[in-house]
């Protein structure tokens, strides 16, 4: 019986006298159709290296392995260690937020691979940030199940109410697409919110040198630090306001331009011009 079976899952939990832990955002996917849709969306091919975060009982791990992927899984809850060790993959009981992704090579990881995961919702943003700041050149694609509200935020367009710093951050590294929505009925126990799968196709090259990336995101974080403010006011602690006004005018923007109306490409132009003034 597949690990996506709710009967199999509940039988396991009874056998270890365990339960889903809310503190770890444990809502287990128990819908085989959704698992197959994730696999298709993720573009996993036989022989691909795949990093999975929070496998839990291993329902997603099982379909990744059936596709011929080499899976490395990071799971925080030791309750699942013995069960996951029965699958032909590398399992590490660890906190994914603290795990050094550079050590994947020690486990045989070769070249560019993929991330495919049902991310714990309480650490979604720290993990997405970690994937790209720690080793952005390691991934071909990143396909994650996250809270629907967050999925809409990271796929928002300039001018949308959800458009923000995380949107700009992820679009710098990848083409980010909202794939599909997932009902709470597809999980055990049922979460109180809807979920969604987001697929990111990572760029072959990035628009800035590695040495400039941190400074650029300091600018974009400051820009969105207080959403209702004008861009020039948001950046006043980083750059003199008159310089910001000068750059905005040079690019054809009004002094009243707000951060949530600006595209990534325009932020890059603003960054370069402010550096050169």
From Swiss-Prot:
Q: Where does S-adenosyl-L-methionine bind?
A: 27, 29, 54, 75, 95, 118
Record-annotated membrane-spanning stretches: none
Main localization of the protein described in the UniProt heading = cytoplasm
Catalyses:
adenosine(1518)/adenosine(1519) in 16S rRNA + 4 S-adenosyl-L-methionine = N(6)-dimethyladenosine(1518)/N(6)-dimethyladenosine(1519) in 16S rRNA + 4 S-adenosyl-L-homocysteine + 4 H(+)
Provide this UniProt record's keywords sorted from A to Z: Cytoplasm, Methyltransferase, RNA-binding, rRNA processing, S-adenosyl-L-methionine, Transferase
Instruction: Name the top EC class.
Output: transferase
* Pfam entry (one): RrnaAD
**What Enzyme Commission number(s) does the record list for this chain?**
2.1.1.182
One molecular function GO term is: rRNA (adenine-N6,N6-)-dimethyltransferase activity
**One GO BP:** rRNA methylation
Its function, per the record, reads: Specifically dimethylates two adjacent adenosines (A1518 and A1519) in the loop of a conserved hairpin near the 3'-end of 16S rRNA in the 30S particle. May play a critical role in biogenesis of 30S subunits.
Family, as annotated:
Belongs to the class I-like SAM-binding methyltransferase superfamily. rRNA adenine N(6)-methyltransferase family. RsmA subfamily.
The cross-references to HAMAP family, in alphabetical order and at most eight, read:
16SrRNA_methyltr_A (MF_00607)
Q: What is this protein called?
A: Ribosomal RNA small subunit methyltransferase A
Source organism of the structure: Chlamydia trachomatis serovar D (strain ATCC VR-885 / DSM 19411 / UW-3/Cx)
Gene name, Swiss-Prot/TrEMBL: rsmA
């Amino acid at each position: 019986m597949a690990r996506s079976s709710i009967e199999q899952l509940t039988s396991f939990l009874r056998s270890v006298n365990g339960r889903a832990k809310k503190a770890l955002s444990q809502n287990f996917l128990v819908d085989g159709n959704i698992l197959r849709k994730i696999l298709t969306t993720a573009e996993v091919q036989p022989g691909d290296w795949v990093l999975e975060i929070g496998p839990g009982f291993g329902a997603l791990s099982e379909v990744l392995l059936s596709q011929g992927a080499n899976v490395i899984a990071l799971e925080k809850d030791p309750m699942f260690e013995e069960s996951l060790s029965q699958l032909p993959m590398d399992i590490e009981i660890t906190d994914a937020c603290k795990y050094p992704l550079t050590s994947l090579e020690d486990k045989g990881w070769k070249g560019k691979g993929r991330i495919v995961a049902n991310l714990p919702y309480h650490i979604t943003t720290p993990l997405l940030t970690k994937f790209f700041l720690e080793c952005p050149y390691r991934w071909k694609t990143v396909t994650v199940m996250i809270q629907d509200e967050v999925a809409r935020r990271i796929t928002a367009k300039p001018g949308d109410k959800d458009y923000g710093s995380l949107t700009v951050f992820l679009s710098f590294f990848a083409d980010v697409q909202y794939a599909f929505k997932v009902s709470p009925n597809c999980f055990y126990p049922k979460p109180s919110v809807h979920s969604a799968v987001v697929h990111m196709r990572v760029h072959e090259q990035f628009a800035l040198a590695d040495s400039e990336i941190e400074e650029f995101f300091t600018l974009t974080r400051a820009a969105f630090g207080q959403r209702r403010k004008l861009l020039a006011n948001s950046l006043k602690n980083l750059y003199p306001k008159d310089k910001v006004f000068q750059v905005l005018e040079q690019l054809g923007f009004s002094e009243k331009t707000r951060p949530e109306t600006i595209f990534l490409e325009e932020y890059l132009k603003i960054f370069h011009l402010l550096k050169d003034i």
